[in-house]
């Protein structure tokens, strides 16, 4: 397949799956296996980081009005009942720290030992079952229908649950934070919005850290990666993936925010279960 067409295709996959609760990591790995992609460890790692960054950067653009509102109302919030500690911006930082510290320690200890197809398929399957149960049992029964009404305890809980996605590839950061939000008493829309906001610091920091490691020719576990030789062809490939991922992710976020207000997450849970079973069956037959 033409390299530029492949970059566009993978950009579409990343843009479609980064913010849906289906695991972008798993889908990129599936594409890598099915399409027999061999770009070299170094360039593949860099390309994955760049298209992920493209998807992430659509969030500040899409939520620019909401972000401006939060900064303008700090520290009391739009309700006027907040302190600096309970403001949505602070809660986002608290949740991020509750993820960042343990996730960094776990990935240092575990490295890439859990990045197997079996683990990924199992995480997709189990995550789908959990999401289905949570969405059915807690379908918009929560009292927290806005980020402005969140508590410190909810932020800590969601941040800690997000660690699962860092440790077990295939879990999905979106799935873990959305389900945690619903379990803590948030409505679907509120849980989804906080998941999006939390992903901004989480994924920007994680992506920058991964990029730094890649530029130093190291993977997450510290193992050596091949040296990436960047020429015009390589830069164009990265640019295509980045731009396509950004555009697709922007429209996915807009669609998902509308979808969740009238529908639930069960269709995504079913999809995860089906894909998880298929991945496990394929892995066991190899």
Curated annotation (Swiss-Prot):
Miscellaneous comment: Bacitracin is thought to be involved in the inhibition of peptidoglycan synthesis by sequestering undecaprenyl diphosphate, thereby reducing the pool of lipid carrier available.
Protein family: Belongs to the UppP family.
Compartments where found: Cell inner membrane
Stored InterPro entries: UppP (IPR003824)
Organism per entry: Koribacter versatilis (strain Ellin345)
EC numbers, comma separated: 3.6.1.27
TM regions (residue ranges): 43-63, 91-111, 118-138, 150-170, 189-209, 236-256, 264-284
GO cellular component, one term: plasma membrane
Example of a GO biological process term: peptidoglycan biosynthetic process
Functional note: Catalyzes the dephosphorylation of undecaprenyl diphosphate (UPP). Confers resistance to bacitracin.
Membrane topology: Multi-pass membrane protein
Protein name: Undecaprenyl-diphosphatase
Main location class: membrane
Reactions it catalyzes: di-trans,octa-cis-undecaprenyl diphosphate + H2O = di-trans,octa-cis-undecaprenyl phosphate + phosphate + H(+)
Any one GO molecular-function label of the UniProt entry: undecaprenyl-diphosphatase activity
Keywords: Antibiotic resistance, Cell inner membrane, Cell membrane, Cell shape, Cell wall biogenesis/degradation, Hydrolase, Membrane, Peptidoglycan synthesis, Transmembrane, Transmembrane helix
The gene coding this protein: uppP
Pfam families found in the cross-reference section: BacA
Source domain of life: Bacteria
């Amino acid at each position: 397949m033409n390299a530029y067409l492949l970059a566009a295709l993978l950009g579409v996959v990343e843009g479609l799956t980064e913010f849906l609760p289906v695991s972008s990591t798993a889908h990129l790995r599936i594409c890598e296996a099915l399409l027999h992609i061999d770009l070299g460890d170094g360039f593949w790692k860099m390309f994955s980081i760049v298209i992920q960054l493209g998807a992430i950067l659509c969030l500040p653009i899409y939520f620019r009005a909401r972000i401006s509102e939060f900064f303008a109302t700090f520290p009391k919030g739009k309700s006027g009942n907040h302190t600096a500690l309970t403001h949505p911006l602070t809660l986002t930082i608290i949740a991020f720290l509750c993820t960042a510290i343990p996730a960094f320690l776990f990935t240092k200890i575990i490295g890439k030992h859990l990045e197997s197809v079996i683990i990924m398929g199992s995480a997709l399957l189990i995550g789908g079952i959990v999401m289905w149960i949570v969405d059915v049992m807690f379908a918009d029964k929560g009292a927290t229908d806005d980020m402005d009404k969140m508590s410190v305890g909810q932020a800590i809980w969601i941040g800690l649950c997000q660690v699962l996605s860092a440790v077990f590839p295939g879990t999905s950061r979106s799935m873990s934070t959305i389900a945690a939000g619903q379990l803590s008493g948030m409505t679907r829309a509120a849980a989804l919005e906080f998941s999006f906001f939390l992903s901004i610091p989480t994924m920007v920091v994680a992506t920058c850290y991964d990029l730094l490691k890649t530029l130093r020719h190291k993977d997450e576990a510290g193992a050596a990666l091949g040296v990436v030789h960047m020429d015009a062809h390589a830069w164009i490939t990265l640019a295509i993936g980045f731009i396509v991922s950004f555009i697709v992710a922007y429209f996915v976020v807009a669609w998902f925010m509308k979808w969740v207000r009238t529908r639930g997450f069960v269709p995504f849970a079913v999809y995860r279960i089906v894909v998880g079973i298929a991945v496990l069956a394929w892995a066991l037959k190899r």
